[in-house]
Amino acid sequence: MRAYERLLDYVKVYTTSDPESGTHPSAAREFDLAHKLVEELKALGVEDARVDEHCYVYGSLPATPGCEEKPALGLIAHMDTAPDAGGENVNPILHENYDGGDVVLPATGKVMKVSAVSYTHLRAHETSQ
């Protein structure tokens, strides 16, 4: 499975946090993605992959031979999503050959303003066509 295919699969998992909760994680459903990640890490050879009671996923890979003395690399990311936008029944869309302009959602025709015209800070990342 390619990295973008994994990401498209992950965003389908309902992980919306609960702002009224006093627990960590704020919603038990957040463990669904954590357990999925542990399963995938183990399938990729991360034998010690695990999730703790706070929904943190851990795992380690041995160093490449000859690099054992090099600094270790750590990765960290949020797995929950903000309650501001719905997180249930997400159906991601891959826009192949995206040109950097506004995005039209095929199901509704709704236009998402994401172009450099709408967000001037994106202009620094434009490439000439």
Positions of PLM-derived features:
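Alpha-helix boundary/interfacial micro-motifs
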Residues: 31, 62, 94-95, 125
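A generic, well-ordered mixed alpha/beta core segment in the N-terminal half of proteins
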Residues: 74-123
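Conserved small/polar residues in nucleotide/adenosyl-binding loops
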Residues: 14, 120-127
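N-terminal hydrophobic or amphipathic helices/low-complexity stretches enriched
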Residues: 1-28, 44
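A non-catalytic alpha/beta surface segment that caps or lines the substrate-entry region
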Residues: 22-70, 74-76, 80
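General alpha-helical segment detector with a strong preference for membrane-spanning helices
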Residues: 18, 82-84, 129
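Charged catalytic carboxylate motif
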Residues: 2, 32, 36, 120
